[in-house]
Protein backbone atom coordinates (compact mmCIF):
# COMPACT_ATOMS: atom_id res chain seq x y z
CA UNK A 1 0.00 0.00 0.00
CA UNK A 2 1.26 3.47 -0.90
CA UNK A 3 1.23 6.06 1.84
CA UNK A 4 1.10 9.84 1.84
CA UNK A 5 3.15 12.00 4.18
CA UNK A 6 1.00 14.39 6.23
CA UNK A 7 2.52 17.82 6.85
CA UNK A 8 0.70 19.95 9.41
CA UNK A 9 1.30 23.70 9.14
CA UNK A 10 1.97 25.72 12.30
CA UNK A 11 -1.40 27.45 12.20
CA UNK A 12 -3.19 24.09 12.04
CA UNK A 13 -1.14 22.75 14.97
CA UNK A 14 -2.11 25.81 17.03
CA UNK A 15 -5.78 25.37 16.09
CA UNK A 16 -5.65 21.66 16.92
CA UNK A 17 -4.11 22.28 20.36
CA UNK A 18 -6.88 24.75 21.21
CA UNK A 19 -9.61 22.12 20.72
CA UNK A 20 -11.07 19.83 23.41
CA UNK A 21 -9.13 16.56 23.89
CA UNK A 22 -11.91 14.34 22.50
CA UNK A 23 -12.08 16.41 19.29
CA UNK A 24 -8.28 16.36 19.04
CA UNK A 25 -8.35 12.55 19.20
CA UNK A 26 -10.98 12.32 16.43
CA UNK A 27 -9.01 14.68 14.19
CA UNK A 28 -5.71 12.86 14.80
CA UNK A 29 -7.44 9.59 13.91
CA UNK A 30 -8.72 11.17 10.67
CA UNK A 31 -5.21 12.44 9.84
CA UNK A 32 -3.85 8.93 10.31
CA UNK A 33 -6.52 7.56 7.93
CA UNK A 34 -5.60 10.23 5.38
CA UNK A 35 -2.04 8.83 5.17
CA UNK A 36 -3.36 5.83 3.26
CA UNK A 37 -6.37 7.41 1.56
CA UNK A 38 -6.57 11.23 1.49
CA UNK A 39 -9.97 11.34 -0.21
CA UNK A 40 -11.77 8.82 2.01
CA UNK A 41 -14.52 10.01 4.32
CA UNK A 42 -16.55 13.17 3.86
CA UNK A 43 -14.15 15.08 1.58
CA UNK A 44 -15.13 17.83 -0.84
CA UNK A 45 -13.17 20.23 -3.02
CA UNK A 46 -13.39 23.84 -1.87
CA UNK A 47 -14.86 25.97 -4.65
CA UNK A 48 -12.42 28.42 -6.22
CA UNK A 49 -9.38 26.84 -4.54
CA UNK A 50 -7.13 23.86 -5.07
CA UNK A 51 -7.77 22.79 -1.48
CA UNK A 52 -10.13 20.18 -0.07
CA UNK A 53 -11.96 19.90 3.22
CA UNK A 54 -12.75 16.86 5.32
CA UNK A 55 -15.65 16.98 7.76
CA UNK A 56 -15.14 15.61 11.26
CA UNK A 57 -18.40 16.33 13.08
CA UNK A 58 -18.66 20.11 13.45
CA UNK A 59 -14.98 20.59 12.53
CA UNK A 60 -13.26 20.90 9.16
CA UNK A 61 -9.75 19.95 8.07
CA UNK A 62 -8.61 22.07 5.10
CA UNK A 63 -5.81 20.46 3.09
CA UNK A 64 -3.98 20.27 -0.23
CA UNK A 65 -2.88 16.97 -1.79
CA UNK A 66 0.27 16.75 -3.93
CA UNK A 67 -0.04 13.45 -5.81
CA UNK A 68 3.47 13.67 -7.33
CA UNK A 69 5.22 14.27 -4.00
CA UNK A 70 2.69 12.06 -2.16
CA UNK A 71 2.13 14.70 0.51
CA UNK A 72 -0.91 16.13 2.24
CA UNK A 73 -0.50 19.67 3.59
CA UNK A 74 -2.92 20.40 6.44
CA UNK A 75 -3.64 24.13 6.23
CA UNK A 76 -6.37 24.71 8.82
CA UNK A 77 -8.43 22.88 11.41
CA UNK A 78 -11.47 24.86 12.47
CA UNK A 79 -15.08 24.79 13.56
CA UNK A 80 -17.52 24.83 10.65
CA UNK A 81 -18.74 28.33 11.58
CA UNK A 82 -15.22 29.66 10.95
CA UNK A 83 -14.08 27.22 8.28
CA UNK A 84 -15.54 29.03 5.29
CA UNK A 85 -14.81 32.61 6.38
CA UNK A 86 -11.72 34.22 4.92
Residue positions per predicted region:
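Charged, low-complexity, helix/coiled-coil-prone segments
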Residues: 1-7, 33, 51
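Enriched for short, Lys/Arg-rich terminal
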Residues: 2-18, 22-25, 40, 56, ...
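A short, surface-exposed loop/turn module that caps and links secondary-structure elements
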Residues: 30-54
Amino acid sequence: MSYFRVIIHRKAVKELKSLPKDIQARILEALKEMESSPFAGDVQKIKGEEAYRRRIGDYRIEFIVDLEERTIAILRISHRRKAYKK
